[in-house]
Amino acid sequence: LIASNKSPLIIGHRGASAVAPENTLAAFARAFRDGADGIELDVRLARDGVPVVIHDTTVPRTRLRKRRVARTRSDKLQQIDIGSWFNRAYRGLARLEYTRQTIPTLDDVFRLLANQPSKELIVYVELKAGRARKKNDELAAAVVELVARHQLQRRVVVISFNLRAVATIKELDSSIRTGALFGPRQRAVKSTRQIIAAAIASGADEVLLHHRIATKRIIDAAHELRLVIAVWTVDDPRWLARARSLQISAILTNHPAKMLA
């Protein structure tokens, strides 16, 4: 993991998404203000090849909810209000600034990171890779180019469920840290040995486990091969003691402030 004496690191999952609209600059800034050690976000390619920060293939919770990200230019995506839904859904947390939130580019997020006082904050960038190898390679190349442009090789971890995409990142720039994502769906069909072998084969530095499958057995197996372990998505502070006992290096959470209280 990025050099740190703190364990576990607290990472804002899609920003401080429990208290701000997910994957927005407001959510990322809130996570930093709340004391998070970093943020996690999702990236896809817009029609013009620009990496934009959004989880779904379409734009949910907006009047343009059927618009496909891959078929829309980034400048058009940056005009779409993706914050107002949060104010309507969570009136007690509503803020005027959320009505001005639009889909950010990955470049926007890296610029926000550069403006933070701490130069140790990190970003987990999840590649939302599909089945098309060519498109996945284009996404990986675009992310690597941005990481290099902002000189963030030591502060970014590129992660994905698509382990071919993880391997591509390492092929393009071996200095960028990578992580292999595994959830209950993968655990249902893979043994501990198969999960660890798949992570190693991808060249990953880290294994990111859904909290339901983060057992001592699999964590110990990963540590034996010097793989760093992160767990997602945990909003219960009682998990911190377990994380420390299992030597988990990072926790992805929707609510950094709650985990740090």
Describe the residue ranges of each PLM region.
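N-terminal amphipathic alpha-helix/helix-capping segment at the start of soluble metabolic enzymes
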Residues: L1-G12
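Short, glycine/acidic-enriched loop or turn micro-motifs at the edges of active sites
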Residues: A16, V43-L45, T58-V59, A129
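Active-site metal-coordination segments of metallo-dependent hydrolases
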Residues: S17-E22
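Amphipathic, non-transmembrane alpha-helical secondary structure
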Residues: L25, A29, R33, I103-A114, ...
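Catalytic domains of carbohydrate-active enzymes, especially glycoside hydrolases
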Residues: R30-L45, A199-V207
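Metal-dependent phosphodiesterase/phospholipase catalytic core, i.e.
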Residues: H55-Q186, S202-D205, L209-H211, H223-L225
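C-terminal active-site rim and adjoining tail of enzyme catalytic domains
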Residues: A180-A261
